[in-house]
Structures are given as structure tokens and as C-alpha cells.
Amino acid sequence: MTAKSKVVALEHVVIRFSGDSGDGMQLTGNLFSDSTAFAGNDFATFPDYPAEIRPPQGTVAGVSGFQVHFGHKPVHTTGDLCDVLVAMNPASIKANMRWLRPGTIIIFDSDSVTEKALEKAGYADDPTVDGTLADYQVVKAPISELTKEALKDFGMDNKSMLKSKNMFALGIVMYLFNRELDTVYKYFETKFKGKDQVIKANRTVLDAGYHYADTWELFTNTYRVEAADLDKGKYRNITGNIAAAWGLMAASEKSGRPLFLGSYPITPATDILAELTKYKNLNVKAYQAEDEIAGIMSSIGAAYTGCMAVTTTSGPGLSLKSEAMGLAVMTELPLVIIDVQRGGPSTGLPTKMEQSDLLQALYGRNGDAPLVVIAARSSAGCFYTAYEAARIAMEHMTPVIMLSDGSLGNGSEVFRIPKMADLPSITPPLAKANDPDYMPYRRDEKWLRREWAIPGTPGLRHRVGGLEKENGKGNLSTNPENHQLMTELREEKINRVANDIPLQEIYGDKNADLLVVSWGGTFGTVRTAVEGLMEEGKSIAHAHFDYIMPLPRNTEEVLQGHKKIVVCEINRGQFAKYLRMNFPEYKCEQFNKVMGLPFTIGELEAKFNDLLK
């Protein structure tokens, strides 16, 4: 680095990598995130890409982005406006104009400017010279040509050389933030093991980008974000889907029940299935079924045999699984259903996030078929939510739906790997061999749960199925009084789970003028917006719900004592409707967004300020 570059310390930074779907922006963002983790920063990421595998190149609709928000203090959100934009073509600038703050550094591949590229992006003239970007710091670099120049002696064709241009851009950004290149080198060596030429080519381009930024003095300042004050422990960069997979494995180990996953690939939940297939050595059985129904039915069968059973899906698949979920309710078998929500209805927006499956999760089954519903609040938190879903399912002999979403599942955060000894115990109610008083639907008095009778255990022969059962004995029954009793017992069993979950916390003054209510993946942005207004002296508090069905038993106390209540969610008000149904005496305002994008801190603060007037 030249002596002329001044190193400026920053509290936090938001970087957005943006280009065509084939430009490798997801990989570039992930590699920078890995370097961020090794630098000791706290961070959160937001991948944003089209639903098409190869959308039209050079168009705004085809832009793929990856945002990283990192800092030396706790980071709860993926960031609103970006401080640095890496734009690989004109369409990337067009697509991201609304995410730029005054003074944003735009690192732009000047080789991408052609008449056709400008036309596809909707520009009449080059935005880097016509004044469109006058409020920003535009750093133009001939990234494509310099990539080819760096690889001229490798005997590669033009198309192959340009596949590495994202590494040139990454090199520039690594220089800008004073990052060591070792983490990227290590990735090359692992990813391309045995392909020395490929490793050398990528290293060459990465180095070329780094040294170009240095030699040509592209930046007046470079930047450094000091390491966050993190608790001692082992950390890694983890996505929500991988965190969920790990949480399931931890629950399996803790409970002593083998893990079985029966699932069908669906965006954005597939990575859970893909991750669990790697752990056959840990007695994980992952079965890729031919469809959604086969996936959940295989899991119900596995639960019957004593496995910790799981199925994963997204909104359309949850609809297909509805009848089978009713079977799991009727048989009272432990089952975890993970729904990584996406934009709907129907096929909807497969790669975009939404929270619109809540009412389906609560009520989307025929008959009165209650089950437990909980929601993850962060990518790293998916580990603990999956673990808790498995604990409740096995200890209370019930299906549990865990709600995540695309931004949590694909986004990543710093994750401190916990010690098994620090995780809550999981003790399933296993039936004992040769129990002379055993009956399939005999229940304990405290939780109303039936015992888990593992097939093959002496003296525990029994039948299960979808027809109504006689209380206690478990025989088929169409008796009206018995059906009334069994329906009430199944409902009360779920209600009693409220005695086994934490009380609802409220952040801030319990009698604040405005109570902000949220659930699921909106936690980070809502909490950050509330904290900002608290610092201004505003009378505001925040209640974020992780447990949906049943609600925490002190929920009504939390809702009391406020002039206004506003429920923030990425749907048209489903949790607000649910609260009104359970607590009709409390008036809830709504703040909803259904654009396939998370809330921004700015729009939340504007809404809260308006309600506080």
C-alpha cells in the first residue's frame, strides 16, 4: 500500500456487490464475508438474485446482488443504504440507485459500457459521465481488460478469462478495506484442489486487482473496521439454512434419537437437505423424496420408528404437506416442519423473502388440527430455533412448524458454535418395555402427551393411523363424545406448551407510548430502528415474538399500558389479525411490506415517528 493512502477508521460499513447473474457476485460477496469473519468483525449478509437461472444479460431484471454489513459493534441488520457499490455493468447501477447514500463509492467496470449495454439498462447516455452520479464517488476501472491482461500467458480463451473478473473486483475491495488475501487463497486451494492452473489463475487476477488499486491510487483513503468485542469461542460464517441443519443435528445428539430428514428440494430451503447429506458418519439419514408429500410421509414413518424426524419446505410445499401434517397431529408423533418462506402465492417469488405463510402454518389443515409454531429471528439464530423446535416436538409429542424466510436462510452472520453441555436437555417420553399398563394414548397429567412407543420394544405393540382414536386405548372410534374429548385434549396439549416456553420479553419501557410488535426475520431492522428512536428520547418499546402458537402466557400483559401498538411484518397483516383474534380489546396498527425485500431502518423510523406524533 502506498504511503499516500490515509487509513480511516469506521464504525460500520455496507458493501453491495452487483452484476449479471453470471458475474459471480454471490461468490464474491461470500468470500469478502469470510475475510470479514476472520477479521473479527460482526456482520450480516443479504443475497439478492433473480429467480431465473440465467436471466437476460445486461438487464435490470437480471441483476444479482450480495450485500454485506459489517462493524466492530453488534450488527443486527444487513444495512439500508450502501457505502460501497461494486457495479459490473450499467444495469447494476440502474438497479441499485435507490440504495445509494450521498458520497457512496461506486467501483465500476468501465469496459462494460457499450451502446447495447446502456440501452438494456435504460440509459440514453453513460451515467458515469452525464452527471447522473454526481453525488457519488465513481471509481472507473477497466476490470475486464485488466483481467485479460493478467491472464494473457495462461493460454485461456476470452470467455474463460472473463469468468475471473469478479476476483479482480474483489482484489480492489480487499485493498480498500486493508484486508489480507489469505482467506481467499485458502478458498482457491480448497475449491480447486488438484487444479494448479485454476488456482494460479484466480490468485493472479485477485493480486492484480489488489495491486492495481494500490499502484494507481484509486482511493484517497482506505478504511479499517476494528474487530468486534466478541465473547471467547469458536466462530464461523454461517447461513441460516446451515445453522438450522446444525441445530437439528445437535438436538438429535442431545436427545439420543437418530436424525431423519425426508424432503423434496425447493427454493429457498434446499440447502438444509444438502447440508445434512454430508453427515452420514453422524448417523444422519437424509432422504430426497420424489415430491413434497412423500417427503413428509417418510418423516412421519421415521417418527413412528423412534427417529427425530424432520421435513423442510417453502410455502408451496407447505400447502402440499397439509393433509400429512393432519396425520401427524392425529397420531401425535414428534415431527419438525421447517418452512423457509418466500414470496407467494403459488410459485410467486422463489428467490425473494416474505412472511406470508403464518396463517397457513397456524390453520392450514382440515379439521381442528393444532400444532406448535415458532419462528427464527436471525440467520445464526436458526440454530437455536431448530433445536428448540426439535425439543418441543419430542418432549410434547407434537408436530412443530419452524418458520424461517429466504433472507434468513440464504443470509449469513457470525455464529459462535455452542458447547453441547450448554444446550438444554431433551428428554422424550419413551414408553418402557413390558409395561403392563401401557396404552397408546395414555397421557401424563402435566402435559397431556402420550408416550413414544418404539416398534420392536417388547410389550408395546400398537397401531396408529389417520382415523379418530379412542382416548387411552387408541382403538378406532367414531363415538361423538370421544371425538369431542380427543379434539379438546389435542388442543389443550398445545395450550400447555405455553408453560414450557419463556415469558415474552419487552425491550424498553413497559408503559411506553408506542409498542412495536414484530416476529420472525424482521427482528434486526425493527430493533435497530427502535433503539435509534430511544436514543432520541422517544417513548417507544419493542416486543419481538419467537413463539407464535401457543403465545407466551404473559402476552396480554405485554400489550397493556401503551397508547398505540403497531405490528410490523412482511405480509398483509397476518400476525396482527392473529393478535386481534386472541386479544380483541387491543387495537393494533399495521405496518406491512410485500416487495420481496426486508424492511429498511429508515422506513420503520418514519412510520414510528408518525405514530408518535
What are these regions (language model features)?
Residues 51, 149-151, 218-233, 251-258, ...:
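Gly-rich Lys/Arg/Thr-decorated short loops/hinges at beta-loop-alpha junctions or inter-strand turns
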Residues 238-247, 255, 385, 390-613:
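Flexible, low-complexity linker and terminal segments
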Residues 1-255:
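Active-site cofactor/cluster-binding pocket
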Residues 13-20, 169-171, 259-262, 309-312, ...:
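Short glycine-rich or small-residue beta-strand-to-loop segments that form or flank ligand, phosphate
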Residues 49-50, 188, 205, 226-230, ...:
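A glycine-rich phosphate-binding loop feature that marks nucleotide/adenosyl-phosphate handling sites
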Residues 12-101, 246, 251, 259-260, ...:
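Thiamine diphosphate
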Residues 69, 87, 107-109, 139-142, ...:
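Short beta-strand segments
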